[in-house]
Regions:
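ABC ATP-binding cassette signature C-motif
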Residues: 1-101, 161, 165-395
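Flexible nucleotide-interacting loop at or near the entrance of a catalytic core
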Residues: 95-186
Length: 395
């Protein structure tokens, strides 16, 4: 598997003679036991390791210093935080406040010197004795401006997601003797309005199939339970029942499926024209929505030309506009940068509805109320705590 290949390569590098390792997303494709193994190796190795990662748990458990690439109007810069990830966010906030204060003081002093130069210029016209003071003030202003202002405040990515939802029946999802053919043995389950449920288990255990069944409206879906997007959802062969509650509108997010309905169209065009399930938006309104998701600069790009993270943010924006009351999220943080992942967590916290999320993100899982675990033995069970050590299902 991809995870096994990644682990083999990392093992070879860690055992090799090189004293410095440069690792680009070393945790990608690793399951949670694999990530824990990587953390142990990084903490034990005597090598110098510089790695890129968006896994907040990995960063918190291994990084001794954090290097942040910061965007700026005059070019990008690098800031190094001498502590770990847990203190990084507050340290960056404090640094921004210091830079803002330094700029405010510089602007005040700059204005004061300019005012002095202007005053002496006027007075020197009528008093030759002030000419030397006027020239000295001009020199002072020139040198002050040559030194220039302090470092500019970096441009922050300010993503604001607004997932609204709405009131539904008390029982959002009810499963009775539900089995997924060839994957999962029969199980019963009740999910209540407003719950945040983490769906856990090894790859191939049936998690994504379960979400896909609900995304299609469950067993014999009623009209109000039909999908809220134009994505074609492949049927899931099953026995038993999976029923959605009153006023449940499922919204599905999965980064692995294709989007022929979006390909060939720009983001502004997709929002402006709408679709069968979503009203179109005025150009100005569309631009504001894209700006909230950090996509203003990509408004004229076609969907397929976006990066993985941009596509993920745009799909979440479409979920926001869809009016879904049940969010079915399949690895939602996989391609999101740290700021976007935190914005998603804030939006889910404010969402009036029910959330089911398949995830291997240990940090993100802390936002869940309880967990459904798809076991390697084809059983499904509930847990109050996340379970990460399920073995791969054998078929």
């Amino acid at each position: 598997s991809g995870g096994e290949q990644k682990r083999l390569v990392l093992e070879a590098l860690l055992r090799g003679p090189e004293e410095v390792l440069l690792l680009d997303e070393p945790d990608n494709y690793l399951d949670v036991p694999g990530k824990k193994w990587l953390e142990e190796q990084l903490n034990q190795t005597k090598k110098t390791v510089l790695y890129v990662s968006h896994d907040r748990e990995l960063l918190a458990n291994t990084a001794k210093q954090i290097v942040t690439l910061e965007l700026g109007h005059a070019g990008n810069s690098v800031w190094i935080h001498g502590g770990g990830f847990v203190t990084h966010a507050q340290a960056r906030k404090d640094r921004f406040a210091r830079l803002e204060e330094l700029r405010r003081r510089w602007d005040e002093e700059h204005q004061k010197i300019k005012d002095l130069v202007q005053m002496l210029k006027v007075k020197a016209k009528f008093n030759d004795g002030l000419a030397s003071r006027y020239q000295a003030a001009q020199t002072r202003l020139r040198k002050f401006e040559e030194i220039g202002p302090p470092q500019e405040i970096p441009i922050e990515q300010n993503v604001k997601m607004r997932l609204k939802g709405g009131r539904t029946g008390k029982r959002a999802v009810v499963c009775e003797e539900l089995s997924l053919t060839g994957l999962v043995a029969p199980f019963d389950l009740e999910i209540w309005f407003g719950e945040r449920i983490g769906v856990l288990g090894a790859n191939g255990s049936g998690k994504s199939h379960f979400l896909r069944l609900l995304a299609a409206g469950g067993t014999d879906p009623e009209l109000e339970h039909l999908p809220i997007s134009d994505v074609t959802i492949d049927p899931v062969t099953h026995e038993g029942k999976a029923k959605l509650g009153a006023r449940i509108r499922p919204g599905w997010f999965a980064q692995t499926h294709h989007h022929p309905e979006l390909v060939g169209r720009t983001l502004i065009e997709i929002l402006h024209r709408g679709d069968e399930h979503r009203n179109g938006m005025q150009q100005e309104q569309s631009a504001r929505a894209l700006d909230r998701y950090g996509l203003a600069g990509a408004s004229e790009q076609k969907f397929e030309s976006l990066s993985g993270g941009q596509q993920a943010r745009f799909q979440i924006l479409l979920l926001e506009l869809s009016g879904a009351t049940l969010l079915l999220l399949d690895e939602p943080t996989d391609n999101l940068d740290l700021e976007s992942a935190e914005a998603l967590e804030r939006a889910l916290d404010a969402f009036e509805g029910t959330v089911l999320a398949v995830t291997h993100d240990r940090w993100f899982s802390r936002t869940m109320d309880r967990f459904i675990v798809f076991g390697g033995d084809s059983t499904v069970r509930e847990s109050d705590e996340p379970v990460w050590d399920e073995k791969r299902a054998k078929r």
